[in-house]
């Protein structure tokens, strides 16, 4: 009798993706974050589904429905805390996953990389519309400020903003459509993630050395299934600790106040995972320029494969590029800090310098470092 795992039309696909998949023998823990993102997505969809059963997308009852979930629904407080902090875990894994791709040259799988950038943008859109749903002060004003940025688009800007709002301000129509988007987008993310995997399995995984791993591959199961399981346990441990002991650590206190269009919070700021982009947006004193810089801060990832100048794929044996990579990481942390600070000196100038450095590192310095390192490796005969 033939093995069902290898013959059944559906099980065969799962087998080729997660069981008999030939995998490089030397991929490190940095390769765990793809599967962790899968688990994050499943957690978010499940907790979100249960929240949606009790939530009402109406300006008069949205805030109360969230309070009702936390007070009256069985384990509603836990479901809500897991969903809110699950978003933070999702973005932590995303940033590490993208960072790993940059460090080890995984972006040279261009199709996989481009789908990944689209995935990142989709997850950011989902998180943004989701943040509006509790209808607290920061939800309302965050939605107002960010959607208003579209009015910077010449000619069609104002019409576009009113079209998205469904009226002349952020109101019931906006909340209802944002709930609809927040419900549908995770399923689109799931479909895109499958395409992401499809493209990845066309080429096989990269590895820390950046060399061709075909000469030394091992089956995904049991080696990497057990390694992924360890990652799942550690991530769920961190998530549960966060959700149980300090669920509001990463949230904004202003969101405990119901939305009030007549009262603006002193500092409007998004969740921590958007602060780096928000700092870049604020560092340009022109509205349209700021919006373009905000878009560029994410879309610059698309051109990274074109900026690869080195003969080596990975940064593993390239100390100058390694230094620049960690400088970029520190710079992003600086931008995240600046995004949460008020618009006053010295924060304005620090934000502007960090924004300039961000683009300079990616577009100018890292390609130059790649060329320099190649030059240093060339044997110089007298």
Swiss-Prot record:
Cofactor requirement: heme b
What residues form the membrane-spanning segments? 33-53, 77-98, 113-133, 178-198, 226-246, 288-308, 320-340, 347-367
Residue numbers binding heme b b562 = 83, 182
Give GO terms for biological process.
Answer: mitochondrial electron transport, ubiquinol to cytochrome c
Q: Where in the cell is it found?
A: Mitochondrion inner membrane
Give a GO molecular function annotation for the protein: ubiquinol-cytochrome-c reductase activity
Gene3D superfamilies in the cross-refs: Cytochrome Bc1 Complex, Chain C
Keywords, A to Z, come to: Electron transport, Heme, Iron, Membrane, Metal-binding, Mitochondrion, Mitochondrion inner membrane, Respiratory chain, Transmembrane, Transmembrane helix, Transport, Ubiquinone
Q: Which domain of life is it from?
A: Eukaryota
Q: Which GO terms describe its cellular component?
A: mitochondrial inner membrane; respiratory chain complex III
Annotated positions binding heme b b566:
97, 196
Binding site residues for a ubiquinone: 201
Q: How is the cofactor bound?
A: Binds 2 heme b groups non-covalently.
Q: Which CDD domains match?
A: cytochrome_b_C (cd00290), Cytochrome_b_N (cd00284)
The role this protein plays is: Component of the ubiquinol-cytochrome c reductase complex (complex III or cytochrome b-c1 complex) that is part of the mitochondrial respiratory chain. The b-c1 complex mediates electron transfer from ubiquinol to cytochrome c. Contributes to the generation of a proton gradient across the mitochondrial membrane that is then used for ATP synthesis.
Q: How does it assemble?
A: The cytochrome bc1 complex contains 11 subunits: 3 respiratory subunits (MT-CYB, CYC1 and UQCRFS1), 2 core proteins (UQCRC1 and UQCRC2) and 6 low-molecular weight proteins (UQCRH/QCR6, UQCRB/QCR7, UQCRQ/QCR8, UQCR10/QCR9, UQCR11/QCR10 and a cleavage product of UQCRFS1). This cytochrome bc1 complex then forms a dimer.
The miscellaneous remark of the record is:
Heme 1 (or BL or b562) is low-potential and absorbs at about 562 nm, and heme 2 (or BH or b566) is high-potential and absorbs at about 566 nm.
Q: What is this protein called?
A: Cytochrome b
